[in-house]
Amino acid sequence: ADMLINVVDASNLERNLYLTLQLLELGIPCVVALNMLDIAEKQNIRIDVDALAARLGCPVIPLVSTRGRGIEALKMAIDRHQQNQDIELVHYPRPLLREADKLAEMMVTDIPPRQRRWLGLQMLEGDVYSRAFAGDAAHKLDVALAHLSEELDDPALHIADARYQSIAAICDAVSNTLTAEPSRFTAAMDKVILNRFLGL
């Protein structure tokens, strides 16, 4: 893909940003369409769009799609945007990055480095579909997981929790609403369980 358009529900920013972070980690140019701002405003939710764009390292365009507000600005952003800023969006535990990078080194070189690391993390998280693109690295996954088991009890949970911590920090900086810490941890657990047992 040359460009990713990520439509985010402004009235439920924290939940929607999980996918946003995953897309941005791919390193593919991305434009975030911040939709349903009218609903967010009715719920007294305020979002600093410029601050959100700075945190994500990509354009964020406010939209009210039902009224056609922001559509032209979105088209313009799509035409002009060429590359996301190189920002470390998620602070993963070092053992996870170490094993993800080892897996990435075994993948074909025509896959960009950031996408190889992303695939490595997805594999460690338990995403079976990522193995189809990983080449020889797929055969070394068990070794990587064995190494991790000596330092981390559950790689998938640590990956999800790191992402939710980043999301919480972003929401705290750009919005007047923030879910409590226990709820974020529960959401991380839910994400892992859904991924493993429902294929979501």
Question: What function would you assign to each model-found segment?
Answer:
Residues 26, 54, 114, 183, ...:
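Short flexible coil/turn linkers enriched for glycine and charged/polar residues
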Residues 160-162, 188-200:
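Hydrophobic alpha-helical transmembrane segments
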Residues 31, 41-180:
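Alpha-helical transmembrane helix bundles of large polytopic membrane transport and channel proteins
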Residues 1-61:
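Conserved C-terminal guanine-recognition region of P-loop GTPase G domains, centered on the G4
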Residues 2, 165, 183-187:
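Alpha-helical membrane and juxtamembrane elements of multi-pass inner-membrane transport
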Residues 175-192:
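Cytosolic juxtamembrane amphipathic/interface segments immediately preceding
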